[in-house]
């Protein structure tokens, strides 16, 4: 479990409206923690009588969890069932390097064009420069105009290529802001448990990229 996946999941739990009532896609999912949390939040939101979704939101709401590795995809499908979100959550093969950064749809690994989504989620999906390029292309192609990308990565001192991501997002036309997660919510998002995650180093900075695809 990467530290950024835990951090992004905690951020979503404090900002459930970021995914509730929306169609979300997690890219480079690994074990799928972030996508699973998004799906559980959607189910809880829908079950809470104080939260009212219109018919269009109810029909649209759902989560797609993706990765490119066949074994990982099989494990993701198991995790979706294990967490009882298989009614609103699907697993799809997606390779960053098959996305152009100029398209109005994203491609599954079967080559089929897929509908764009409201929200793209990603955590620690960059470990080399080409990943930054591919991830930016994927976020652009996957998002509807007006859609939002929410990405958390360890800083460039710990993940090679992350320092390129901001510029690559701008290249494909995404509006981009970057925040240090340690400075949000009085540091509570990073307050405990990270020593148990893979690759965590004391003092590691986790960066929150908020991306916006302009309306056409």
Language-model-detected regions and their locations in the chain:
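S-adenosylmethionine-dependent methyltransferases
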Residues: 1-216
């Amino acid at each position: 479990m990467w530290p950024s996946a835990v951090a992004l999941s905690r951020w979503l739990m404090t900002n459930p409206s970021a995914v509730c009532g929306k169609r979300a896609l997690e890219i480079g999912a690994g074990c799928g923690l972030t996508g699973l949390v998004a799906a559980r939040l959607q189910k809880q939101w829908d079950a809470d009588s104080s939260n009212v979704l219109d018919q269009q939101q109810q029909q649209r709401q759902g989560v797609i969890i993706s990765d490119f590795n066949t074994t990982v995809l099989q494990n993701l499908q198991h995790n979706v069932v294990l967490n009882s979100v298989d009614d609103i959550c699907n697993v799809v093969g997606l390779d960053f390097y098959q996305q152009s950064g100029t398209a109005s749809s994203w491609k599954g690994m079967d080559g089929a064009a897929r509908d764009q989504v409201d929200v793209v989620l990603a955590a620690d999906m960059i470990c080399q420069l080409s990943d930054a390029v591919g991830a930016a292309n994927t976020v652009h192609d996957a998002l509807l105009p007006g859609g939002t990308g929410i990405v958390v990565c360890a800083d460039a001192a710990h993940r090679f290529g992350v320092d390129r991501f901001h510029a690559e997002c701008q290249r494909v036309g995404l509006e981009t802001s970057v925040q240090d997660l340690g400075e949000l919510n009085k540091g509570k998002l990073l307050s405990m448990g990270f020593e148990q995650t893979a690759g965590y180093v004391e003092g590691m900075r986790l960066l929150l990229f908020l991306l916006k695809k302009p309306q056409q």
